[in-house]
Curated annotation (Swiss-Prot):
InterPro entries (UniProt xref): ATP-NAD_kinase_N, ATP-NAD_kinase_PpnK-typ_C, NAD/diacylglycerol_kinase_sf, NADK
Superkingdom: Bacteria
Taxonomic source organism: Burkholderia pseudomallei (strain 1710b)
Residues of the active site: D75
Name of protein: NAD kinase
Cofactor: a divalent metal cation
GO CC entries: cytoplasm
EC number, as in UniProt: 2.7.1.23
Recorded name of the encoding gene: nadK
Amino acid sequence: MKIGHQFHTVALVGRSNTPGIAEPLASLAACIAKRGFEVVFEADTAQAIGSAGYPALTPAEIGARADVAVVLGGDGTMLGMGRQLAPYKTPLIGINHGRLGFITDIPASDMREVVPMMLAGSYEREERTLLEARIVRNGEPIYHALAFNDVVVNRSGFSGMAELRVSVDGRFMYNQRSDGLIVATPTGSTAYALSSQGPILHPQLQGIVLVPIAPHALSNRPIVLPDDSKIAIQIIGGRDVNVNFDMQSFTALELNDTIEVRRSKHTVPFLHPVGYSYYATLRKKLHWNEHPSSEDDDDA
């Protein structure tokens, strides 16, 4: 068993518009408060479920006050809170109340048993990288964002191919005609990048993956770059080209706009139950080894 730091103040976060989330959040709050932890709620979550008796805090206030944030929802909820809390280094615990759950790895049915043990110090910790990106127009930055999974430059559904000029560390890589280009973290390699035939990167691997979306030339293949690379994607052709930062869209791109992407100085600490296995997650979520032996289960 791995013993880490015991926490004191615990922030609870849920996807506020999800039906049926109020009861498990209230149940978890009562469970951990009974064990002596101070419980606070993220403000939108508190408003949605009516968490009377617990302080309601903004993400910035959570970052300043809470020792850990417990997120009940899907991967999207976890990604959004991770971006907001990244500057504060607040650790995240993810409880799966969504569908896929690559990064919310605790089943909701187990949370009342597992979460208190983790808050008491029994957990495994890892750091996840983020990307920071900005849009540059006529030499001036006009937009800035963080991305946990990916930065995606793509065409709209009704326009032709986008034409992109891609440079890495100031050196020309290629011009590409395609439906778009994905720049993904190791965490994001199992998201949109995977559906576009990109490789899976272990989350502790220091790399950034570029994955073309339906390229005109089949020789345009995914490539994994060092994670200190500085990537520049210039719009040189096409119309109605968009850029998304973890599905947060900026839709007003113009010809010659450049999207600059690099690893963020921030990382997000993820906490897992003792015995967590990334490979077991892949096996379960991607349906590898559908009929494992009991020996395989013991090694998970």
